[in-house]
């Protein structure tokens, strides 16, 4: 979890390959209306996000027997609660990726994505840092972060 540009997808793909667990890109589950809204530089509301979070929650349920890695902003505690669906056999293991805002800006400028740089501030303002998560500064290498996650999962 983390704001746009924090490296969720990059880490998630690499971690999925390392652990032989499927990876899901949360952005792929946004309704077209949400994507259009973000492209028009309008921040999403809680109401906009709810159908997206419900869809992601259903995906987590589908994959619970073998596990899945999901890249999702999950900016607020209430979003994480919705994703920690009471129907799940196990609670999600949260990894919070963070980095300084200048690095985030550089990353967002250099990529093709429907989430424009203009909306980064709205995500940072909305972000409620998780109390129960493995916090990783993504200035580390992907391999270092994967090793930290593996150690945490084995404890």
Language-model region placement:
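Conserved substrate/cofactor phosphate-moiety recognition/catalytic segment
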Residues: 13-55
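Conserved lysine of the Walker
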Residues: 8
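Glycine-rich phosphate-binding loop used to anchor ATP phosphates in small-molecule kinases
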Residues: 47-91
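Small-molecule kinase domains that catalyze NTP-dependent phosphoryl transfer to phosphate-bearing small molecules
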Residues: 110-150
């Amino acid at each position: 979890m983390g704001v746009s540009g924090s490296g969720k997808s990059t880490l998630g793909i690499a971690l999925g390959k390392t652990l032989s667990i499927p990876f899901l890109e949360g952005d792929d589950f946004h309704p077209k209306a949400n994507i259009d809204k973000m492209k028009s530089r309008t921040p999403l509301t809680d109401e906009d996000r709810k159908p997206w979070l419900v869809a992601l929650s259903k995906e987590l349920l589908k994959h619970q027997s073998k596990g899945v890695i999901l890249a999702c902003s999950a900016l607020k505690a209430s979003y994480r609660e919705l994703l920690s669906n009471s129907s799940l056999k196990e609670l999600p293991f949260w990894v919070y990726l963070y980095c300084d805002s200048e690095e985030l800006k550089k990353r967002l400028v250099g990529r093709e994505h429907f989430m424009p740089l203009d909306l980064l501030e709205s995500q940072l303002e909305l972000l409620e840092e998780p109390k129960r998560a493995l916090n990783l500064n993504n200035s580390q290498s992907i391999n270092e972060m994967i090793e930290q996650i593996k150690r945490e999962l084995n404890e």
